[in-house]
Amino acid sequence: MSERKRHAQRLFAGIAPEYERMGPLLSFAQDARWRRFMISRIDAAPGSWVLDVAAGTGLVARELAETASIRVAALDQNEAMLRAGADANRRAGDGGRIVAVLGQAERLPFADGSFDAVTFTYLLRYVDDPQATLVELGRVLRAGGTLACTEFHVPRGPLVRAGWRAYTTLVMPAVGRLASPAWHHAARFLGPSIAAFYERYPLPEQIRIWQSAGLHHVRTRVLSLGAGIVISGAKGDPER
C-alpha cells in the first residue's frame, strides 16, 4: 500500500465514529445537496445494482436505497468507516438493500459489467493514479451505465476563493481542534489536499482522463458557489 493510501487509512479511521455528525463541517454543510445531485445523474431503475465506492459510513448508499429502492454494494478500504456505516444502516432500516464490501477502488472484487451504475465520493485525491482508477471503475459498469462522482472544488471567483481559503485554512481547523485531535488533523489536511489536486488536475484535465478511461458524454456541474462539483459519464459508444 502506498503512503498516500496509508495516510487515507489513518485519516478516516480516526474520524469514523463522528463522521456523520462532523462531516458537514468539511463541505460548508452542502454535502447532502451534492449527494442528491449526483444521484440524480445516474440511470438506475428500482431494483438495479449500484456500486458506491469510497462509501464511508454509507451516506450515499442509504440515500440510494431509500429514494429509489436500489440495491447497493457499498465499498470502502477502511473497516472503521464500514463498521460505522453498518450501525447507521441498521438504525435507518435499510431493508437489507445495502451490502458492505471491504476493498480498494483500484482492484475491485467484482466481475466485468456487474453494476448498472457506479458512484464515488471524495475518492480520486486519495489514489495514486486517477485515470487507472477510473478505468477500473468503468470495468465493473455495464455498457450504457453511468459513472458519477461528487468532489470538493476550488471556487474560481477571487472573492469566493478568498472566502473558501479562509474557511478551509482557519475556520475548519479551529472547529476540528475543538472536536478531537483526529478531526483537527483532517480539517487541516483537507484544504491543501483539494488545492493540490486541482493544481495537478484542473477541470479540463479531469474531463480528459474521464474520456481516456472510456467514459463518454462527460458532464460537470459546479455547485455551492464553486465549493463542490459533480462529474458524470456514460460507458459505451460515444456516438450514441
Where are the predicted features?
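Conserved beta-strand signature within the Rossmann-like core of class I S-adenosyl-L-methionine
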Residues: 145-152
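Core SAM-dependent methyltransferase catalytic element
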Residues: 213-240
